[in-house]
């Protein structure tokens, strides 16, 4: 990387990191060279420099070294052009055509100019072509094709690509692009249309500017369509699309024109000619800008005052009233995050509800992106459900965040049990009052980064008035009035401060401190009044109350009460203020003061009388806005309270409570060591000899012998054979033995290589392992002697190795791990997982590191530039430094001791860490690794914090990338029992419960029964496996596209693992490691089949998805049957013999008749005589489906629903008509005209488009999922018809071809249908299928228009598959079938792709491409960790582990690719390469939006009141603005400080509580206390989104469970008949227990009993309990019939309310009715009261949205409640006692809807 982007300090920092890296690598290489490990060298390579990256990413081969030489000699700009020269001169090989030279030169040069950043040369440029100026002189010119995602490359890179393109054009001797007026006007239109219809451009050029650029840019800026928005300038010559070309628009507008000034610098530096026009453009623009500014200023001076006065005259609404109105009209509450609430994870605030989280703009020093900082007091008052690092689901700006502390934002305002109201702004106060809180009136501030609004493109909400806004208004007023320049958040010039203080009559020291730290230093209330009076600025926000929470009429009432209050007055600087206010304790007045957020207390003055006491300074805060009661407050229409105050009072107010945000708890924080399941200490196989605990020591003590699959090595010197790499006898490096699985012969590596790894005796592929006998006692004794470790309790190995080579770890490493109490991961490393938390600044005392040590590490000055001297100074974190949790420190200390022991006792080298305490690890290096990533990144430990998160720079977290597939990748899944091929984007949408985890969105909860098909390499079969979660992550800068033989292809991220077949086995490679010629599997697919005779249309249309049509679908032909069952229906239905489906379904329900009992009938639509028979025979239906997929389409209008088929041959049309009649009967018409057959029927239309989901047109048609599970005979019917329509049999060669514009349809047919017959095909593609249409071309030539281009795919069947096709399927027509006779006798060519497991096809071409979308997708397949995508290609998925850290030397010494599982996770989540130097430009672009300023300026707050888009606000500097400059690494500022980054709860209460019932009880208790939460809504949502789905899901799991052996853990689909494990004789047990199913039932029933939930929800719980009871009553002996106790009789109550009598026989509390030998109910018990006995059922209908309940102080169990009632006596006494309790209703305050009343 070039030196110019670092400061000297950062350069020294990176050099110091590299020195430590080199030191660690040198030690590891020395150790590895001894030959005791699988490889002689370290297996974790370092990432290359810029030149290396350029070569590996864009090529050409061999260019890296030349780039280094040229950059050193000329600098990167000239070097880029020199490389272009050399590429075009052929110095890097013959590339073929001019286009190839041009493309290579452009990409390589641009990669150099952008420092090897991937996004510009690869993501931005889709193609490079040489075209002709056909509309001019026919000369050749260069065209660059840009893609939509070019935006992420940045404007400078976009502009540079054009410049480089022009240079390449000149070198190739091409003419310039000569656009016609059509070209120019087309681009003018596109720029404007894109800005209006798609997204706002950062720079929207004027039409003339676009024309200027188009006429002068020497190359064509074009691209493929990115948006389906049509232009009016259509069919322009040379432009391939009539839609918007987003990439080209961005390059022209935001690249060339916006960055014109910067482009001029490059033009001059690189000496490129012909660009004088852009220099003139820049000069003209600068002149125009300055003259415009002068014009605006003079205009403002002349007319400004008049316009303001004119505006005032026209005002009819108050300012804040209008703002609220505008706010409500433009920004609606977002309820999405409340759709699901997990039991035990509270809702903290309803959407946009007053009293929830108050939005505060800013960034704390422990914030970066997707982070909220809140006051630690808020965490404590919310029952510690929020701890540092807890994840939350949020209303806006993004979907999720983690929580960090900030003590300089406001905490909660609470009412205590004694009636006092307290502002809890500090942790100490929170600790004192936490147990006394009665109601949380205001939750507190949520500090949200402006960059999060930019990233999520969320409209800015009006800012609430805060201290950082007020201090800027103070500074501005001092400047305007006294002409004294001061700066907020800074140490100001002392003289200037003293001058201002003298004018203001305040203490200079106070003013100096106030300006330096306005968030902590606050004026007393009298000074605040004085400053507002003197400077005419709003009242200080600390003393401003939530006035707009009240209605004007309520403030009127409050003022009247204050007029009768006892008030103690005082005076300061001639301003009167209240010192104390004593009010009568009126219920309404008390509530008004609470809603104002006014601290006060209740004081007893007489025996029963209490008064409200408001002390200083809050007495003044209350009365000052009311003018000290000197003017009368009167409510005014269309005015808020603050509007009225500002109209009448001399001291004005700003609203401190406009914008509120809702949130709920997500996942708790995490920090713990990574262990395999079960934990492992050495990767050494022991089989069953070690017992269930896999204890090698135990096996050795018992003298057992183990038979395991393991790699053995043979000493070439003395012949010793064993699992060791180094001979224990003579110390020679051994050779790997390759084993013949047939004859059992072993061959050393050198011999096996000569034999090409095939047995010379039997020609079988050799394996690097075999099942061998090992003696644990001998091996363990030898290992103990080697490292002198003896007294161990156990040594846990693995049952078997899952790696490809099955090489075992040295046992010595395991012994040393046991000694140090650490555990190994699957790749040989030791890891610690932690939740990511961002931090940009820290104090030495917060991380436990001394000032002296930090100076050694390069921290010489604090963030303000002062020398580091104290441990409380704030330092800016360097980008690759990390602060680990104490838990990590303690564990890594053990790891360091293990590494030292390993070096000393195993390798015989000096100890490295010598760490006695965890502070000794400071300065040492770690590798950070995130889930779905390939490359780790080097980090340096600088300290530890007492939290459960890993603090690191936002850049560091963003540098850990993910690997996934594009969203349009198709994947083979099973949905509700039917196989389907859907896109990954569609799969993601089939899951819910989205969480934001470590920069990726994760969903784990399926909406349907979804499984994925995987390939099992051991059995060679395709099997179903569960999906653990699906992932959506921001796309990387570019993707790799693999084109395989036979027309197959797929795309993935660069580091994604790919499964390839090599040396007789399946191995994983990173995508960038895959080479042309590597073989990838297309597996044999054998899906389970079931025979179906007919399709029941009545049953299909009775499904819920057609409920909206049930009144209109008519069932005909069942009148007699309806009479026979005495159905209660209208006589008219019987007379006409036509009944609505809705009525029939009601009859079936009432009569308890199943739909199968309804006799054969016909279906039609109301007022339509067309009828279709109910039972559709499958064979003719499939014939029609085949014709439909080939030649059919569906059409609908307001009154017409048709299926049409276009067929040329009469024989085929007759076959279709015959099939239609056989399938659907004679109740409809078939219309034939020319070669077209049409059927008019809405039933048939819905059958094909909605039931079968066969699509509507050529582009959307798909094979119905039902067909995939049918037997071959049935499928042949469909295929015969399909190939008759879309297929042809060629006469010239033995080949069948099917043509379609729909690739997905062809893939369905080939991969899932033809595969049933053992038939495979290959794909070809015609980019212009119309080229042979001479008449069509002539038509367009005559009119001067461009002929349309039709892209057509072809599925080809040849070779032996050709013969199979005709023998098993064939065509319908004799004409096509007869062609087979021409080739029947020809012997087919041998299938060279066939293998035992399927087809092995080679990689034909690899190319880097630009992603089409902003996100990529993946999933975690539970067992096999691979998936089947696109044309049946097997490839790996992503892994889903937590972010982890490991000591660098541990990874270098112990990581080996030979340990990585061949399946089950493979190479994912392993440090295959490590990035040594972080480049902010290359990390995830989300962090580029993080702001880096000390405070947000006044212009920003004004913009929020205008509800502007964040992208319109240019006054806040972000990381993006610094990219490519030294400042991108350092000088980052923050807006809000915190006293301590570790202040706050360390562990969420959620993790500390026990069972779900306890968690939900605490969750609801908190909901009852929070004013901004409706606890009844919470209860309802928990039941519907968590408890019921879990109950039902567990119930389903029980019926589908496997059985497990307790001894060897083998699982069986069905229990063995012997009742014992066939393998080891162990006991067989269930994998899903009864308790697991019932565990949430008590919680659910408690919720429906205590909280007002809908009847439907109660019914769901009743039905679920009944289902559980029914399942188990015959399976288990009934010891306890009901779990719920006294809260259980919900269903009994509902039955009684509806029928007037109790159905005790089927009730759920039979035991309480005296049945089954249980205790009988007492009439006065609480259970009786709940069931409704002893009183009339309520007639009042419960509303869908119940009113809020009275406050419930505690959640007591119902059993306890019943006992208390019995102790008090009767239920009547209990009721009376309850009624005497004081009742207080919660009040939400004022939401946006309530603000305006009804």
Curated annotation (Swiss-Prot):
PTM statement from Swiss-Prot or TrEMBL: This protein undergoes a protein self splicing that involves a post-translational excision of the intervening region (intein) followed by peptide ligation.
UniProt-recorded Gene Ontology molecular function terms: DNA binding; DNA-directed DNA polymerase activity; endonuclease activity; single-stranded DNA 3'-5' DNA exonuclease activity
Domain DOD-type homing endonuclease, residue spans: 1184-1319
Organism the protein comes from: Thermococcus kodakarensis (strain ATCC BAA-918 / JCM 12380 / KOD1)
The entry's keywords: Autocatalytic cleavage, DNA replication, DNA-binding, DNA-directed DNA polymerase, Endonuclease, Exonuclease, Hydrolase, Intron homing, Multifunctional enzyme, Nuclease, Nucleotidyltransferase, Protein splicing, Transferase
Transmembrane segments: none
Functional summary from the UniProt entry: Possesses two activities: a DNA synthesis (polymerase) and an exonucleolytic activity that degrades single-stranded DNA in the 3'- to 5'-direction. Has a template-primer preference which is characteristic of a replicative DNA polymerase.
Name of the molecule in the record: DNA polymerase II large subunit
Upper taxonomic lineage: Archaea, Methanobacteriati, Methanobacteriota, Thermococci, Thermococcales
UniProt-annotated stretches for the region Disordered: 286-309, 1699-1798
Residue stretches of biased makeup (Low complexity): 1714-1731
Biased composition (Basic and acidic residues): 1733-1753
Pfam families, A to Z: Intein_splicing, LAGLIDADG_3, PolC_DP2_cat, PolC_DP2_central, PolC_DP2_N
Annotated gene: polC
